Amino acid sequence: MGARASVLSGGELDKWEKIRLRPGGKKQYKLKHIVWASRELERFAVNPGLLETSEGCRQILGQLQPSLQTGSEELRSLYNTIAVLYCVHQRIDVKDTKEALDKIEEEQNKSKKKAQQAAADTGNNSQVSQNYPIVQNLQGQMVHQAISPRTLNAWVKVVEEKAFSPEVIPMFSALSEGATPQDLNTMLNTVGGHQAAMQMLKETINEEAAEWDRLHPVHAGPIAPGQMREPRGSDIAGTTSTLQEQIGWMTHNPPIPVGEIYKRWIILGLNKIVRMYSPTSILDIRQGPKEPFRDYVDRFYKTLRAEQASQEVKNWMTETLLVQNANPDCKTILKALGPGATLEEMMTACQGVGGPGHKARVLAEAMSQVTNPATIMIQKGNFRNQRKTVKCFNCGKEGHIAKNCRAPRKKGCWKCGKEGHQMKDCTERQANFLGKIWPSHKGRPGNFLQSRPEPTAPPEESFRFGEETTTPSQKQEPIDKELYPLASLRSLFGSDPSSQ
């Protein structure tokens, strides 16, 4: 960061930090904006050291300005940052970004007027293209500088890392600024993989070339001396034209920008490829119940860039779908902001929604609205703290106990109604589930059989002689008594009917 921070000196840095991002806004430029700009320039294969001088900033602005119409918001922010930095280097007093852009536009208009005046003075009315990579040498001839390996490497790396995501299109537009059809074909030929996408791109180029030939038929008759032939669709695509012919068309008066035309065809094909590689529709982008609003906005705008629609339609999608497809928590907040809220206000308002702090606040608000204590106890599901309603044993009414009863004292036991004892000494027992008093002290309880079943077989003594009939019956009693001891039966049921 030290190297990037050395772009401005002490006094220049103070001026930098006083310039506002927006007219009338509170936010001002910081050192982090310079660090971000230098990193973005490295992504675009541009030397960040150019930021240290005003001339370097002017060169960068000249490269970025043609791409502002088709570039992304990041590219526009980079252009604005470098424009303000240029004004600081030039010691031009500006208060905000808009004022810096106006100063640069005014300076560019002055330089154009000077160039036109100089051309009029020298009698040269032809306007010659000075776009890189076609430059004018010392002899005044227009020569072509081949595209650098560094630019090709940056393009290949973008395709390998991003595949064909929406940000590939502005990157291609920036790297191919002012390129000839031969340079554009070199960039396309360096793409090793994604041959299916390359085949789709070739088909789109062939369709556009055929449309060009249909709209621009060849004029009959010979070509006048000193005149160039009109380019066909295949000439624009660089397949049937030489580099010298391409330079001639681009520098002719009036010029035929074959490079820009071919570049427009390629971008049209890239848009189709991006749509194929991004099959998700903007209508399917919805915020998850626990997804941060910032991540949802990132997914939304990434998918929106792949949509093939006009800017008016995209603005309508942003205003409508961004709020409509948010989760219920964020949707409530966004609707409260109103339709005129900016994206910055939305992200600030929805920051932290879905986290533990937000859930705690929602729960606290819900609990504060509940004022009935009985409702709180029902929500907790805990009934142990609820008091049972008391009932007086003397008068039978609820709300007080017998000790505090004002009615005449009832005589006798409060349980059975008999006199001679109190309720604590009452011997009456409650009825069991069969409706009978238990234990009854009258034999077995009610859920036992009250009589034994009689055997259906004939008695044993009918099969024996007279002298042996009395012996088994005498021995049967002690056996029964040993099997069912009276002590254990009394402990369970009170008394045994066999002992009675």
UniProtKB/Swiss-Prot annotation:
What is the protein named?
Answer: Gag polyprotein
Stated consequence of mutating residue 77 to A? Loss of ability to fuse with target cell membranes and infect host cell
**UniProt short sequence motif PTAP/PSAP motif, positions renumbered to this chain:** 455-458
> Per UniProt, what does mutating residue 166 to A do?
Loss of infectivity
The taxonomic lineage of its organism, from the top, reads: Viruses, Riboviria, Pararnavirae, Artverviricota, Revtraviricetes
The segment annotated Interaction with membrane phosphatidylinositol 4,5-bisphosphate runs over 73-77
Provide one Gene Ontology biological process annotation.
viral budding via host ESCRT complex
Q: List every stretch annotated PPIA/CYPA-binding loop.
A: 217-225
Effect of changing residue 185 to L: reported as: Loss of infectivity
Does the record bear Membrane in its keywords?
yes
Q: Which residues carry this modification: Phosphoserine?
A: 148
